[in-house]
């Protein structure tokens, strides 16, 4: 899943941001490179927990996806994803689909969660 991905809001179905996923020593992480909504360009993670070093930091440039490891043919799991809008962190699972053109990002707590489809941007 290394590369740039356009995140698609699972409710509005509109492009939300671009997240770049990188791999280092077998661990994958993702940083926000771009936010599409002009009104949110200067967004900060105001809702992040007080003990999270990302609290109050700009969302653009922020690492929101951490700790993913390859867990099978096209599955990456074991990491977490931060939703900067609400400051909550979820268990993350990524499945590469459609020959690498898209990925399914599943964020969950226990068995409750939601899935977004991200589209390759590069």
Each language-model region and where it sits:
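Short acidic/polar mixed-charge low-complexity motifs
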Residues: 13-15, 26, 86-88, 112-114
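Short, hydrophobic/aromatic-rich segments at coil-to-beta transitions
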Residues: 1-6, 72-79, 101-104
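A short, polar/proline- and glycine-enriched secondary-structure boundary/capping micro-motif
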Residues: 39-45, 87-90, 114-119
């Amino acid at each position: 899943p290394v590369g740039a991905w356009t995140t698609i809001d699972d409710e509005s179905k509109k492009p939300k941001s671009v997240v770049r996923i990188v791999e280092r020593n077998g661990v994958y992480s993702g940083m926000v490179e771009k936010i599409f909504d002009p009104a949110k360009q200067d967004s900060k993670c105001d809702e992040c927990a007080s003990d999270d070093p990302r609290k109050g930091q700009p969302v653009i440039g922020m690492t929101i996806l951490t700790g993913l490891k390859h867990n099978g043919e096209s599955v990456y799991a074991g990491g977490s994803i931060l939703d900067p809008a609400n400051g909550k962190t979820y268990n993350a699972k990524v499945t590469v689909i459609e020959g690498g053109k898209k990925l399914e990002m599943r964020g969950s707590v226990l068995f409750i969660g939601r899935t977004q489809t991200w589209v390759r941007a590069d």
